[in-house]
Design a protein with these regions (language model features):
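N-terminal alpha-helical scaffold/docking segments in eukaryotic complex subunits
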Residues: 1-52, 62, 171-174, 182-239
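Short inter-helical turns and helix N-cap capping residues of alpha-solenoid HEAT/ARM repeat scaffolds
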Residues: 16-17, 48-49, 79-80, 111-112, ...
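Conserved hydrophobic register position within alpha-solenoid helical repeats
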Residues: 24, 56, 87, 119, ...
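Amphipathic alpha-helical scaffolding segments comprising HEAT/armadillo-like alpha-solenoid repeats
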Residues: 1-12, 31-46, 65-77, 96-109, ...
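TPR/TPR-like alpha-solenoid helical repeat scaffolds
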Residues: 56, 93, 157-160, 184-193
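Alpha-helical adaptor scaffolds
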Residues: 81, 89, 93, 105, ...
Length: 239
């Protein structure tokens, strides 16, 4: 009895040999079959090898978006973190605007950092024209979150929105957390100068925030632009 193509693919993707799984994913993308979509999405949730996962996503982009986008959208609500993160990653690669429906506040605030970061990236790629400010506002709720890599991911996402992100970033200038304020200032700097380095931008932003003290030294949280050379070195309250 002949084995169905989707069953053969599932068996190959279940091999203990990563090279076999990689070849199976490559073949599934080279010779698309509608029956492969569920198999590919299911495998994304458990695949341990980065290169195989990347090939699985590529294979999904080779299939009709009418099939992949609805299936991936459902997968973004899976109980398995890897399933959610890979679904967002795949949606961003498919690039179909219908995938925007999966980018919710709960996804952007996902407790799993890999899921959150994937949803941030998907959000800036899939956001409909005219709703860039909306996604910027959602992303700004994550300012100050996580370690350097997480903050860099958010910075890249917001910087990609360009001027659309500026109102949300400026609103964060009066946030009670110094870390949030510094992160926002650093991203504004990156938007103004895309060639700047994140580490330098965040260092300078922290310097400004620290100098302002708690609470901010200016009513609206705007950085004090007075050059150090022009500052009065005497302590406040002295003549």
């Amino acid at each position: 009895m002949n084995t169905r193509p989707d069953e053969a693919l599932r068996a190959a993707l279940g091999s203990a040999d990563a090279s076999v799984r990689l070849q199976a994913a490559l073949s599934a993308g080279t010779y698309p079959n509608d029956a492969y979509v569920d198999v590919l999405v299911d495998r994304c949730a458990v695949e341990a090898d980065f290169f195989v996962r990347d090939m699985l996503t590529w294979a999904l982009t080779r299939h009709p978006a009418d099939l992949t986008v609805p299936r991936l959208t459902v997968e973004t609500t899976s109980a398995v973190p890897q399933a959610r993160s890979q679904a967002f990653h795949s949606l961003s690669k498919v690039g179909d605007p219908r995938g925007w429906a999966a980018v919710t506040e709960s996804a952007i605030q996902d407790a799993d950092e890999s899921v959150a970061r994937a949803s941030w990236r998907a959000g800036v790629i899939l956001v409909p024209v005219g709703q860039e400010g909306e996604v910027a506002t959602m992303l700004s709720t994550q300012l100050g979150r996580g370690d350097r890599d997480v903050q860099l991911s958010l910075a890249r996402a917001l910087a990609e929105l360009g001027d659309h992100a500026v109102p949300a970033l400026r609103a964060a200038r009066i946030h009670p957390s110094a870390g949030v304020r510094a992160h926002a200032l650093a991203i504004e700097r990156l938007i103004e100068d895309p060639d700047d380095y994140f580490d330098e931008a965040i260092f300078e932003a922290m310097r400004i925030v620290t100098r302002q003290g708690e609470p901010d030294g200016t009513p609206d949280g705007t950085p004090d632009s007075t050059p150090d050379s022009q500052r009065d070195p005497r302590p406040e309250g002295t003549e």
